[in-house]
């Protein structure tokens, strides 16, 4: 992604909508658990991840679709929050290379169960019903935000995780 776009500088935002408070992480953001946690801490009730992911031009035999779904499901379970992950389908043909996008958009409930999933080959609209009150209650009971050890996390701010 950094080869095609300039990184944003607005931080991670949460928006109030008529349905829920939503946090949106786009494309490459989806691979960083810190992004999901920040949006959840800011009050997001649903995480949205619009993306365009598929085969890697350098290794077109590698299918990362299961790994992609597991990463998003992990964000859902770790933050006890529903996730909506949308992905494009089809092939993008460039002058020198092409890239296949594998679809498989999905929705999870707040414990990481997939409640809706699209296929790889055709456009689909997914609908899923989630219970935001149950999600909030579970977060309060489990205390995953309350019990964090923030005094031990400063190493996350260093690229190599070093203590110095």
Language-model regions: role of each:
Residues 6-45, 135-164:
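Cysteine/selenocysteine-centered motifs that mediate thiol-based redox chemistry or coordinate metal-sulfur cofactors
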Residues 5-8, 98-100:
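Short solvent-exposed loop/turn micro-motifs enriched in small/polar/acidic residues
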Residues 15-18, 109-110, 130:
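Active-site beta-strand termini and strand-to-loop segments that position acidic
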Residues 1-6, 122-140:
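A short, polar/charged loop-to-alpha-helix boundary motif
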Residues 1-2, 11, 115:
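Short, P/G- and charge-enriched loop/turn segments at secondary-structure junctions
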Residues 58, 91, 95, 130-134, ...:
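A sequence-level detector of short, solvent-exposed, charge-rich linear segments
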Residues 21, 27-125:
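CN hydrolase (nitrilase-like) catalytic-core segments centered on the catalytic cysteine
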């Amino acid at each position: 992604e950094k080869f095609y776009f300039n990184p944003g500088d607005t931080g991670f935002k949460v928006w109030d909508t008529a349905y829920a408070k939503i946090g949106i992480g786009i494309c490459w953001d989806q691979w960083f658990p810190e992004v999901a946690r920040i949006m959840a801490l800011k009050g997001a009730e649903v995480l949205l991840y619009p993306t365009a992911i598929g085969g890697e031009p350098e290794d077109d035999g590698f299918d990362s679709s299961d790994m992609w779904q597991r990463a998003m499901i992990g964000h859902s379970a770790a933050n006890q929050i529903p996730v909506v992950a949308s992905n494009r389908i089809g092939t993008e043909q460039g002058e020198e290379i092409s890239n296949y996008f594998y679809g498989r958009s999905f929705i999870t409930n707040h414990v990481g169960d997939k409640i809706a999933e699209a296929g790889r080959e055709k456009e689909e609209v997914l609908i899923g019903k989630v219970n935001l009150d149950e999600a909030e209650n579970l977060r309060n009971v489990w205390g995953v935000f309350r019990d964090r050890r923030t005094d031990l996390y400063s190493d996350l701010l260093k690229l190599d995780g070093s203590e110095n």
